[in-house]
Amino acid sequence: DVPKSMQQLLSEYLAKQDIKIEDIIDFHAKFEKIHPFQDGNGRVGRLIMFKECLHHNITPFIIDMNLQPYYYRGLWNYQTGQEKGYLVDTCLTAQDRYSAICSRLVPKQRMADQLATAQEKASAEHTTDRSHPERSGNPVL
């Protein structure tokens, strides 16, 4: 029964004190096995993982197309009780890739912030510079 299974899953998850990435992955695998929706379970489940990572200050991750076959194999292995490590390793690989992308974006954002600050400073200096004839109120002849 889907409602009972979801209630049990949520109760178990919410009872945990210190959520780690393995707990989020475990929740995801169980959520996907319950399959609460007619369509979109995978997208919803991966979105929940992303949100839970952010909520618990864990670097989130996205399963890209290159990792999809490993993700599906890992999910199958996890849900059938064969092994949990394959899915966990796939998610950790995705997390490493996401971190690498973010680390490349942060310096670009800093550079953009520095440029914006420099432009604001230059603009402020330019508008207060009254030595230019057009700014001093004296007409240019």
Which residue stretches match the model-derived regions?
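FIC/Doc superfamily catalytic core
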Residues: D1-L141
